[in-house]
Design a protein with these regions (language model features):
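A structural motif shared across PLP-dependent enzymes of the aminotransferase-like
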Residues: 108-121
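Residue-level marker of beta-strand positions
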Residues: 23, 102-103, 117, 160, ...
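Mid-domain Rossmann-like dinucleotide-binding core that forms the NAD(H)/NADP(H) cofactor-binding site
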Residues: 110, 133-211
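Glycine-rich cofactor phosphate-binding loops and adjacent beta1-alpha1 units
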Residues: 153-155, 195, 200, 204-279
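Glycine-rich beta-strand-centered segment in the early N-terminal region that forms part
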Residues: 10-25, 37-108
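C-terminal substrate-binding/catalytic core of Rossmann-like NAD(P)-dependent dehydrogenases/reductases
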Residues: 264-328
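Residue-level recognition of short, solvent-exposed, well-ordered loop/turn junctions
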Residues: 13, 27, 99-100, 121, ...
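C-terminal capping/lid region of NAD(P)-dependent oxidoreductase domains
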Residues: 223, 228, 255-258, 274, ...
Length: 365
């Protein structure tokens, strides 16, 4: 269950901005996983992959402020939330390009909680221009995750991606692909979610990635198969990954975005000559304390698209109306209803997410 607790406001530290939250967005799959894990005796509930090793081995020098590194919360409770928008109320002295009063969007499961006030490192914060609704900007983390997954396919203009899963990320992926001139085929066992997709460039909506679905993929790709597949579902079934092998063209790429069964059919994999890659969260820099906590950027000539630049691009696409959030069904509810909202989302296939509100906003809500 989700519990709201009173906590002291965070203390502003070097490299951080203090933000008064106006909207935060629920990521149903990730957050339910964390909530469920708190009920397991002895379990550590966190979003980080191998936190003890991952953060320590990124750089030999380590972070200059180790107290900022995320720690797995104890059993019983876990802070959740990682995508929000709000107004800056204070900045650390070393922050030069963000000022109090600026409107920003923030990411990070170690800091951008469902909370009235958060302290977020500069590299996990992006400016939001006038004209972009705060509740749309609050999806910045989900947008960056979808952008990074799309990049990992390596697809370019005119190619075709099979997207398995028509949830929030799948919906965003279809819109991003269209904005990039890439065609999509979407598979989901939930017909309601397939009907919610309204991006142009969707060649086919498939109720399953079964034999008929795989045949349909080949039919709309001149018999070759999809250039890439993004698996954006949570399931224990191995049929998803093995079906994706059958749906790919020779030499295609599969991007593992969700959590799914990994008992691979070697014959299918070998026959497809497929490349299987992961997509790590919001982009390069994620889980790197030097980047995220010490705010040391990756030079653009070394890494064109970091997690912060992916976040900023999502906000830009919102401002240019290339991404439409109005058509994505979500609940818009006060934070005080969090527990009931998590339960409602779990049983409602037509609602992809929830936006928590925190009183007054710049839209006058």
């Amino acid at each position: 269950m989700a519990v709201i607790r009173e906590e002291p406001e965070p203390r502003l530290r070097r490299g951080e901005v203090l933000v008064r939250t106006e909207y935060s967005v629920m990521s149903p799959g990730t957050e339910r996983t964390v909530i469920d894990a708190t009920a397991i005796p002895g379990a550590e509930s966190h979003e980080y992959p191998e936190p003890r090793q991952q953060w320590r081995k990124v750089r030999t020098n380590g972070a200059t402020t180790p107290e900022l590194l995320p720690r797995a919360p104890g059993t019983g409770f876990a802070s959740i939330g990682y995508s929000l928008a709000g107004r800056v109320i204070e900045v650390a002295p070393d922050i030069q390009d963000i000022r109090p009063g600026d409107y920003v969007a923030c990411a990070g499961s170690q800091c951008a909680f469902h909370a009235e006030c958060v302290a977020v490192p500069r590299n996990l914060t992006v400016a939001v221009p006038e004209g972009v609704p705060g509740e749309h900007a609050a999806h910045v983390t989900l947008g960056a995750i979808a952008i990074e997954a799309l990049r990992r396919t390596g697809c370019t203009v005119g190619e075709t991606i099979l997207i398995v899963g028509a949830g929030l990320l799948g919906n965003l992926l279809t819109q991003l692909a269209h904005a990039a001139g890439i065609y999509t085929i979407v598979a989901d066992i939930n017909p309601t979610r397939l009907q919610l997709l309204n991006a142009e460039g969707i060649l086919r909506r498939l109720p399953a990635l079964d034999e008929a679905g795989i045949q349909a993929v080949h039919e709309v790709t001149d018999g070759f198969g999809a250039d890439a597949a993004i698996i954006a579902v949570t399931t224990t079934s191995n049929e998803v990954i093995n079906g994706a092998f059958d749906a790919l063209r020779v030499g295609g790429r599969i991007v593992a975005l969700g959590q799914f069964g990994m008992d691979l059919d070697r014959q299918k994999w070998f026959g497809a000559q497929a490349v299987l890659v992961t997509s790590v969260a919001y982009g390069p820099g994620r889980y790197d304390p030097i980047y995220e906590e010490n705010n040391i950027d990756l030079p653009i000539n070394v890494m064109r698209w970091t997690e912060n630049r992916n976040m900023a691009l999502f906000i830009r696409l919102l401002a240019e109306r290339r991404i439409q959030m109005d058509n994505i069904p979500s609940l818009r509810v006060p934070l005080e209803t969090a527990d009931a909202t998590y339960r409602a989302i779990g049983g409602n296939a037509a609602t992809l997410t929830a936006v928590f509100t925190y009183g007054a906003s710049r839209e006058g809500a």
